[in-house]
Amino acid sequence: MQLARGVHIRVNDMLSCLLIDKNPNERRRLTQLLSGLGLFCHERDGAEEGIRFCQERKPDVVVMEASGLPAAKEFLRLVRYQNRTTKRPVVILYADKPDLEAVGESIMDGAADFLMKPFDRDLLQFKLEQAGVLPH
């Protein structure tokens, strides 16, 4: 399906989610969780691919593994810059062992929230509700 640049993706009226994680097993697990919450997932394995995806399409939410925080930081800055005048996707980051300074910087750079792994469906749903992606 060919879409015009900047078009928000909706599949059967589902919210779209860009999931970025290098680990295919983790992407599969999170896709199942996010799909169970009513989101249609597009998977990418790195920030560069995620940036290209966001340039071509406008997901409603981005859920991103942030262990390589320099890439996550660059991703947040580019998404913020490219979407100055349009709706930005909500970005939620997660990591195994985030340091508090990096978490704070990510929030300042535009991330809606930060999760510590491991997390379950209930916590993910709560964070998506808090960010305004899902209804309460």
What kind of feature is each model-predicted range?
Residues 24-42:
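Two-component/phosphorelay signaling modules centered on CheY-like receiver
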Residues 63-80:
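Conserved phosphotransfer microenvironments
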Residues 129-136:
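The C-terminal output helix
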Residues 119-128:
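C-terminal output helix
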Residues 45-61, 69:
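Acidic, metal-coordinating helix/loop segments flanking the phosphotransfer/catalytic sites
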Residues 73-74, 97-113:
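Alpha4 helix (beta4-alpha4-beta5 surface) of REC/receiver domains from two-component response regulators
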Residues 93-94:
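Hydrophobic/aromatic residues positioned on beta-strands within the core alpha/beta folds
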